[in-house]
C-alpha cells in the first residue's frame, strides 16, 4: 500500500506534519482520532469516559482494517494506536511508517505550554505520566520504517518525503 503512516507520542506533531504532507503529495489526510470522533459523534475525552479505553482501541483497529486496501493517504495516528494489539505490524502493512521522535524534554515543554484538555491520557499536565508513557512506547515506535529525529518542521517534511520516495523506489 502506498500510504504514509505517522506515529509518535502525543504532541510530536503528527497532525501538523500530516496536513502539510497531504498537501505536498496530494494525498488524502486521515487523522485517526478525528475519524473516531466523527464515527462515534463524540469527543475522544467523552469516548474514554463513557466506554473506556478498550473500546477506543477497538475503534482504532477498525480504522487500520479499513485502510488496508486503500492508497494515497497520509494517516496521522493517535499516540497509542501503534502500541496496542501489536498494531505497529498492521500499520506497516498499510504503508510507510514514520516515527516522529521528539525528545522527552521538548514534549514536556509542549505539554506545559498548552492545556491539552482534549487528550484523556495527558490530563492534568502530568509530566511523570508523560515520561513513563515515553519510556513504555519508544521501543515499539522504533519499529517504524523510518525515524525522524528533527524538531524543525520544514526539515522534517523534506526528510519524510525523501525517505518515502526511496521506500517506494522512486
From Swiss-Prot:
Pfam families: SKI. It is found in: Cytoplasm. The keyword S-adenosyl-L-methionine does not apply. ATP binds at residues 11-16, 119. Its cofactor is Mg(2+). Keywords: Amino-acid biosynthesis, Aromatic amino acid biosynthesis, ATP-binding, Cytoplasm, Kinase, Magnesium, Metal-binding, Nucleotide-binding, Transferase. The keyword Kinase applies. One of its GO terms (molecular function) is shikimate kinase activity. GO terms for cellular component: cytosol. Pathway: Metabolic intermediate biosynthesis; chorismate biosynthesis; chorismate from D-erythrose 4-phosphate and phosphoenolpyruvate: step 5/7. One of its GO terms (biological process) is amino acid biosynthetic process. InterPro entries: P-loop_NTPase, Shikimate/glucono_kinase, Shikimate_kinase/TSH1. Its main location: cytoplasm. Its EC number is 2.7.1.71. Belongs to the shikimate kinase family. Catalyzes the specific phosphorylation of the 3-hydroxyl group of shikimic acid using ATP as a cosubstrate. Monomer. This is Shikimate kinase. It comes from Clostridium botulinum (strain Langeland / NCTC 10281 / Type F).
Amino acid at each position: 500500500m502506498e500510504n504514509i503512516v505517522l506515529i509518535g507520542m502525543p504532541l510530536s506533531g503528527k497532525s501538523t506534519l500530516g496536513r502539510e504532507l497531504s498537501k505536498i503529495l496530494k494525498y488524502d489526510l486521515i487523522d485517526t482520532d478525528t475519524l473516531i470522533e466523527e464515527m462515534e459523534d463524540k469527543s475522544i475525552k467523552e469516548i474514554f469516559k463513557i466506554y473506556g479505553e478498550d473500546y477506543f482501541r477497538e475503534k482504532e483497529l477498525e480504522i487500520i482494517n479499513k485502510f488496508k486496501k486503500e492508497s494515497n493517504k497520509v494517516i496521522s495516528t493517535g499516540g497509542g494506536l501503534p502500541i496496542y494489539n501489536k498494531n505497529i505490524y498492521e500499520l506497516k502493512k498499510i504503508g510507510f511508517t514514520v516515527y516522529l521522535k521528539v525528545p522527552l524534554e521538548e514534549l514536556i515543554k509542549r505539554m506545559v505550554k498548552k492545556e491539552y484538555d482534549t487528550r484523556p491520557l495527558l490530563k492534568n499536565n502530568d509530566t511523570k505520566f508523560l515520561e513513563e508513557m515515553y519510556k513504555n512506547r519508544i521501543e515499539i515506535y522504533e519499529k517504524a520504517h523510518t525515524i525522524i529525529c528533527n524538531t524543525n518542521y520544514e526539515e522534517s517534511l523534506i526528510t519524510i518525503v525523501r525517505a518515502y520516495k526511496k521506500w517506494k523506489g522512486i
